[in-house]
Amino acid sequence: VNHPQITPISQKFIPLIGVICVICGLGWIGVGIQAQGSQPKLKFDFGPGKVAPGYTQVVKDTIYDKNSGFGFEPGGEISCVARGGRDALRSDLCTSDKPFYFSVALPEGNYSVTVTLGDSDSGTVTTIKSELRRLMLERVETAKGKFANRTFTVNIRTPAIKGDGEVRLKDREKTTEWWAWDEKLTLEFNNSHPAVCAIEIKPVEVPTIYLLGDSTVCDQPLEPYNSWGQMLTRFFQPGIAIANHAESGESLRSSLAAHRLDKVLSVMKPGDYLIIQYGHNDEKEKGEGIGAFTSYKSDLKKFVTGARRRGGNPILVTPVQRRSFDAASKITNSHGDYPEAVRQLAKEESVPPIDLNAMSKLLYEAWGPDLSKQAFAPNDNTHHNNYGSYELAKCIVDGIRSAKIGLASYLLSDVAAFDPGRPDPIESFAMPPSPKANSVKPLGN
């Protein structure tokens, strides 16, 4: 499956308003893209059978373009079938034995997405990711003739900063990562037999968890790389959004210069959260006054102060460990004083801390020098694969609970307690890879 053609930001903004279409005498109303506050619920019925009242039909030839504002991304091998029956919504569906993408043009904001999954003729297994591979639904199974409705909340964004300016994007953010910034909501349907009958999308005003950090946090666009930030979405209920503004190669200083913090603060509302994890690239910076307890700590405080000024709740995360074992199979300290600087600032400013540095040390040592390789991308001791980032996301969740942070109330009921010293065996982990892959390491290795 190919990603959509990449175009410059200036050519990509699409003001779609009230597109009204009549096709094949069905008289359906097309998707109107308006300001979020007045935008109606968007309802799509997948398959060539009867169309449920109030829904827009989607068939295999419904390919996304800027005029319609919705459709499958080009390159998918999709089959849409009608099974017959009285229930217009569940009597037809679209499926594939390969991953496929469906996109809808929408303004920046948070959206509640409800999917109807299943097939009257066979069992189904569906995994859903959003935007740049954010895990929304890990595995939804339905038996033959059974259907499941699932709801999740997705954040979409643009580079524009309210008031003035825009985020200074890196080249990769304009190409392989463009889905993170375009004016579209993109869903990836994956696993052995994904089957989608319907999708409903509506704008919602809900609390948002913003993430800022480096390549170990950001939405990695390509396999085999992944981060805890793009796995974290799986563990939260609908009704709270996660907006991942982290980026590969970033330090506190470079994120400030690129206006990433400005962007987050421009959309942050009172009661929102900001989770901050830097250090991997900050420790490489050189010069007078540069150091863990000087420039790093001072810049980190700017993030804390900025969030609080907007009525937000900052959370400080110590940098995740690198895979660096000594002769005794213990993790060495590759971050110097930077984790301690985070701990100090958290205490001084009364900010809830998540000590991922300490938890990842326990995690890696539990695996040991050999098994730990299974949690990282090949020939990489910094960046994780799907399994490694999933386990680290569990560490973050455990840290949220341990720190008694308010957002713990938004965790899903099936999220069990996690002990980093006893990681899940890799044999128990099954995550279908997304289609696009690249062996080039993320920035900031």
Q: What do the predicted segments below correspond to?
A:
Residues 130-131, 236-238, 310, 349:
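Short, structured coil segments at secondary-structure junctions
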Residues 259-413, 421, 432-445:
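Alpha-helical cap/lid subdomain in secreted, periplasmic
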Residues 91-93, 250-255, 330-332:
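Short, flexible loop segments at the rims of nucleotide/cofactor-binding pockets, characterized by
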Residues 1-39:
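Intrinsic disorder/low-complexity segments
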Residues 36-222:
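Compositionally biased, intrinsically disordered or flexible polar/acidic segments
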